[in-house]
Amino acid sequence: QFNVMPERYKDYSLLELYDELDISMRYIAYYTEIPSPVGLKYTDKVKINEKEVDSECRLITIDTPYGELTREIRLTSDRNWRTSRSCIKTREDIKKATWLFRNTEFYFIEENFDKGDKFIGDRGEPQFFLPRSPYQSLHVDSSWMTLEDLIYAITDLPSEIEELMNAIDESYDRLYEEIISCRDKVRIINFGENIDAYLLSLKYFEEYLVPFWEKRSNQLRRAGIYTHIHIDGHFRPILKYLKDLPFDGLEALTPEPQGDVLIEEMKEYIGDKVLLDGIPAILFLPIYSREELYSCMEKLIRLFHPRLILGISDEIPEGVDEEGIERVRWISEYCKSFKTGKGDSYGL
């Protein structure tokens, strides 16, 4: 059930729950009610209008010199507004969107980062995720295109779609420059790409994703900022690329039984990169035993420690019962005993 905690924890604040379980925090603007440190603004030329169709449907229209871009959003069962019809369908729509991004600028809000840093305190290193690469932005952010429409556009209108991707990339310039100017406090950055290798071809992976990452991640790394990338889908087709990706860490790689790769294969292919997370989320559901969770956790620690920030790939399932949360506590206690050299199958 959405937005409902098990009875034992129903009155806990987010920070109280983290402290009760003795676990670390990572992201400053994810379920924290802290505003994102990534801002977005348009030039005065951009006009955006929102029209309510009914209580659960709205139309958002963006005026451009080439006509309107319109997307439909609907209120879903989790009470969030989500895109139900994307806005780029035709060659003319691509032209409109290119104009829009030429009049769009992302920027860094240092004040929001400071708020998040204060909120997290000593519970972890404050981090946030960047806007996605142009390819991922166009279809993962479904307000723009469906995956099917993107693939057709790349095939039929390559120059137009690449011009749009360039416009998206350039809209990030100020953001990266301002982050780098705050490198004394911003030390780790996430590329929140949400990669699933079965939703892209290796050709597009090499042509559109890797070059963007090399440009932008290395821009940050040259300034002394560590980077990691969020790969929370299937990733067997890209195993051979992992060790050479321009990141210090790989976040949310998900092994079997939820993903499509063995833990041993992850170890073989990621080289000396830091693994963030690694425990499949479904192991916190009652259909899996603590013994199965322990086996996975112990293997991750044995193979990846000390280049490991143990966590859930990529988050605990919504609607878990009290046992699911108690498994988080149990892992925390195990890890503390592991640090003292006393780790065993605690609590099984």
List each model region and its residues.
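Active-site loop segments of alpha/beta catalytic cores
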Residues: 3-9, 63, 95-348
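Short, low-complexity intrinsically disordered segments
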Residues: 28-29, 40, 79, 97, ...
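Segments that shape or occlude catalytic/ligand-binding pockets
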Residues: 2-43
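Generic hydrophobic, aliphatic-rich segments that mediate packing or membrane embedding
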Residues: 14, 54-58, 112
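Intrinsically disordered, low-complexity segments enriched in polar/charged residues with Gly/Pro
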Residues: 35-38, 46-50, 138
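A generic structural motif
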Residues: 27-33, 85-89, 345-348
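A contiguous, low-structure linker/loop signature
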Residues: 44-103
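Short linear motifs in intrinsically disordered/low-complexity regions
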Residues: 4, 20-23, 45, 50, ...
